[in-house]
Amino acid sequence: MSINPNETTTGFNQLLETPDTMELAQRIIENYHNQSIQQILEINGKYMSDADRERVSNGVDSIKAVEHTPEKGYTGFYLLNNGRSSIEVSAINQLQMERSTKHETNHFASTNREIIVPQPDRRGYNVYQTVGTRQASWFHSNETGKDSEFSSKGRGLNEGLTTMYTNQQLMEISKEKGETAERQGIYGHATEICTQLENILGKDTLKEAYYGGNMQNLESKVNSIAGDKSFENLREC
């Protein structure tokens, strides 16, 4: 993939500046999202189904730059809801916006599945959702419009893989960007475990699970090495 000449050491300090307007921030994250999709498909498209490659190539349904709110504790957010995908990224400096956009774009590019099971007796429906290696479920009430009975597993492994792939992709663009992202230590413990897991199992097994949805192979390999039920513990790292 091509490298923007502004993304050299000379222009690196410019990436630490905050955009003057939200309109500019919006254009910046849209550009980073499109660049990320191109890079992810080039590197990892082979692990995806034809339908997923098409979904990813079309981009997320909604992407928005938002004012940064430190008390939220995050700079980016990905949501899959009723088959619609959306990303929000805090308008901070361009370096952080690129990392956050790439991180959330990886969530979008990972396995995204949503099964809705009607529950007419309860006047609502159950949702069973997979994003990457994280699985979640909940009940939605048509009467109140509210969700309840939340259940989730695999968030630790999912965030560790997402951060590891984000850092690797930034390193492909620029060593300086990759090392800066690594120093931030985002999901540090989970990322370190995923890095060790990649060294043991190889890249393909993890990427087939994350981008391709083949969790059974990953679970089987982990359990064969570490013992039965080890994968369930690993998922919550």
Cite the ranges covered by each PLM segment:
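Non-Sec secretion/translocation targeting segments of pathogen effectors
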Residues: 1-10, 162
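Pan-zinc metallopeptidase signature
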Residues: 13, 179-237
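Auxiliary, metal-adjacent structural segments of Zn-dependent hydrolase domains
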Residues: 14-95, 113-130
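Hydrophobic (often cysteine-bearing) scaffold residues that line and stabilize catalytic clefts
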Residues: 21, 25, 29, 98, ...
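Post-HEXXH active-site segment of zinc metalloproteases
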Residues: 95, 111-160
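Active-site recognition of the HExxH zinc-binding catalytic motif
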Residues: 99-116, 159, 163, 167
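Substrate-binding clefts and substrate-entry loops adjacent to catalytic sites
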Residues: 144-149, 171-182
